[in-house]
Amino acid sequence: MGASKVKQDMPPPGGYGPIDYKRNLPRRGLSGYSMLALGIGTLIYGHWSMMKWNRERRRLQIEDFEARIALLPLLQAETDRRTLQMLRENLEEEAIIMKDVPDWKVGESVFHTTRWVAPLIGELYGLRTTEEALHASHGFMWYA
């Protein structure tokens, strides 16, 4: 047997046509300058709107502060009234508890001054339940 003859493929006569190897992407979107201008415009608009909102927020905050300042004397009067009522109840309870002790003066101040000294929470709530004292010192708590 004889060796087979290999036939090699050859290009067509005149050669192959030119190969287009360049990228042919369509132009789309905005140019770089227009995107930069759009970004700067967005930043300026955002800054302006934040300044406008901050002015409005400051105006509302001043209004809230003025309302609190107007209500503060009323709230302080209610707190003072509640404190004095609790002190009166404590004095009545003290008179009942210490009635058998000689030379005991009910309501005698431990401070040797004629000025008003605000009572401590322990002094106010000493004869009350633990829940009331915790509520006064820490606020309302579910776990107390």
Swiss-Prot record:
Might you name a Gene Ontology BP term for this protein? negative regulation of DNA-templated transcription
Q: What topology in the membrane does the UniProt record assign?
A: Single-pass membrane protein
List the transmembrane segments: 30-51
Protein keywords: Electron transport, Membrane, Mitochondrion, Mitochondrion inner membrane, Nucleus, Respiratory chain, Transmembrane, Transmembrane helix, Transport
- The main place the protein resides is mitochondrion
Pfam family of this protein, just one? Answer: GRIM-19
Q: Which cell locations does it reside in?
A: Mitochondrion inner membrane; Nucleus
Q: Does the keyword Manganese apply?
A: no
Point out the signal peptide segment: none
Q: Which GO terms describe its cellular component?
A: cytoplasm; mitochondrial inner membrane; mitochondrial membrane; mitochondrion; nucleoplasm; respiratory chain complex; respiratory chain complex I
Q: Does the keyword Flavoprotein apply?
A: no
Tree of life domain: Eukaryota
What family does this belong to?
Answer: Belongs to the complex I NDUFA13 subunit family.
Q: What does this protein do?
A: Accessory subunit of the mitochondrial membrane respiratory chain NADH dehydrogenase (Complex I), that is believed not to be involved in catalysis. Complex I functions in the transfer of electrons from NADH to the respiratory chain. The immediate electron acceptor for the enzyme is believed to be ubiquinone. Involved in the interferon/all-trans-retinoic acid (IFN/RA) induced cell death. This apoptotic activity is inhibited by interaction with viral IRF1. Prevents the transactivation of STAT3 target genes.
Q: How does it assemble?
A: Complex I is composed of 45 different subunits. Interacts with CARD15, but not with CARD4. Interacts with STAT3, but not with STAT1, STAT2 and STAT5A. Interacts with OLFM4.
The protein's matches in PANTHER family, at most eight in alphabetical order, are given as: NADH DEHYDROGENASE [UBIQUINONE] 1 ALPHA SUBCOMPLEX SUBUNIT 13, NADH DEHYDROGENASE UBIQUINONE 1 ALPHA SUBCOMPLEX SUBUNIT 13
Q: What is this protein called?
A: NADH dehydrogenase [ubiquinone] 1 alpha subcomplex subunit 13
Organism this protein belongs to: Pongo pygmaeus
Whichever gene encodes this chain, its name is: NDUFA13
